[in-house]
Regions:
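Long, intrinsically disordered, low-complexity accessory segments associated with secretion
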Residues: 1-190
Length: 190
């Protein structure tokens, strides 16, 4: 018989919650059409290992998160594994997928602009992502697309940020019980 005992506990830890739809880089060099229906949107939380009940080195293992319901009872929200974490460092956990947020994604255009040798290919493709929110409140969804090669966003329905050399991100506000559409066209060169 195995019994699990909590090593430590912290309450009222301020967290930053993020809804994340993450793409893949394979579909920027070919023609695909539909890329996914009812795709899952990940739920992440981030907190700093400092302050009340924290601020000590955290050992590698499982962290479970609970949230109080309307009656004040702790309800299990999710869990994730962490590596050894020093004090004053941030911790990011994936709690699972949102069951009331989905996305439909499709490629709306594709063309090869150049390329006859192994490394001189230029492709241009367009995408549409429809985010659907069944929650009673509006949410902000981060759409993160890993872009291969040397890439340029040619046009977009909302401004992106270049999160890293190979990553574009959009912050899409999705209304309560509604939907929002992100469209963009990208040129990639290998």
């Amino acid at each position: 018989q195995t019994k699990q005992v909590a090593l430590m506990s912290a309450t009222r830890v301020p967290v930053k919650k993020e809804f994340l739809l993450e793409g893949a880089n394979y579909y920027y060099s070919g023609q695909y059409g539909e890329l996914g229906q009812k795709m899952k949107v990940g739920v992440f939380v981030e907190f700093d290992n400092k302050g009340e009940g924290l601020g000590i080195p955290l050992p590698r293992g499982v962290i479970r998160m609970y949230k109080k319901d309307s009656q004040g009872n702790a309800q299990f929200v999710g869990e994730d594994r962490i590596d050894h974490t020093p004090k004053n460092e941030s911790v990011r956990l994936k709690l699972g997928d949102a069951f009331d947020l989905t996305a439909d994604k499709k490629q709306t255009a594709f063309r090869k602009l150049a390329g006859t040798s192994r490394y001189n290919y230029v492709f241009e493709s367009a995408y549409e992502i429809v985010l659907k929110n069944a929650k009673p409140e509006a949410v902000l969804v981060t759409v993160r697309e890993p872009m291969p090669g040397d890439w340029t966003i040619v046009s977009e329905s909302q401004p992106h940020t270049k999160a890293a050399s190979g990553t574009a991100e959009w912050q899409v506000k999705v209304p309560a019980e509604g939907r929002a559409t992100l469209s963009y066209r990208v040129r990639v060169m290998y």
